[in-house]
Amino acid sequence: MKLLFFFLVLAVSAAVAENAGVQKAFMDIEIDGESAGRIVLELRGDVVPKTVKNFIGLFDKYKGSTFHRVIADFMIQGGDFENHNGTGGHSIYGPRFEDENFTLKHDRGVISMANAGPNTNGSQFFITTVKTEWLDGRHVVFGKITNDSWPTVQAIEALGSSGGRPSKIAKITDIGLL
């Protein structure tokens, strides 16, 4: 009986350790003032804890910010809570912080840090709508969306243009941990 209990504790501990650092977050979205749904994210703090800490630490600033760059069949980009055009934002660590690692890859539906080159992560992020392997090793992936989030992501993607300027305003109205 004691041996069975030991193995049960060991199995539960292993399962908890495997999920340690993975957190779920949400973004409620509106398009031109009308609710467009919710994006649920699985944040991989087990792989990139500093990057996830930065993202979570900016929740209050992300509230009310927009997806300022939207390109169909590529990605939707947000996180510029200062200028709402891709020129602003900063990290919780200062203006910029270094690339943590490139372990996670740019599959369809991942959330990744936007940057201006190596070690220039701030607050801006993007969600891919297709596989974008050419970004591997250049941008830090820190999570992915859940399958039920696709309708909301696709509603934002539908606003896109080849130049990236969205046809309507897609805004984060609320954001937090689940």
UniProtKB/Swiss-Prot annotation:
| UniProt keyword DNA damage, yes or no | no
Per UniProt, the keywords (alphabetical) are:
Isomerase, Rotamase, Signal
Tagged with keyword Acyltransferase = no
Q: Where is the signal peptide?
A: 1-17
Return the broad EC class.
Answer: isomerase
Any one GO CC term of this protein is: cytoplasm
* Boundaries of every PPIase cyclophilin-type domain copy: 26-177
Under the heading Gene3D superfamilies, the entry gives: Cyclophilin-like
- For this protein, what is the EC number? 5.2.1.8
A GO MF annotation of the entry reads: cyclosporin A binding
State the superkingdom.
Answer: Eukaryota
- Biological process terms in GO annotation: protein folding
Can you state which reaction this protein catalyses? [protein]-peptidylproline (omega=180) = [protein]-peptidylproline (omega=0)
Q: What family does the Swiss-Prot or TrEMBL record give for this protein? A: Belongs to the cyclophilin-type PPIase family. PPIase A subfamily.
Question: Its biological function?
Answer: PPIases accelerate the folding of proteins. It catalyzes the cis-trans isomerization of proline imidic peptide bonds in oligopeptides. Up-regulates interferon gamma production by bovine T-cells. Stimulates high levels of IFN-gamma production by peripheral blood mononuclear cells and T-cells. The IFN-gamma-inducing effect is blocked by cyclosporin A (CsA).
Q: What is this protein called?
A: Peptidyl-prolyl cis-trans isomerase
Q: What organism is this sequence from?
A: Neospora caninum (Coccidian parasite)
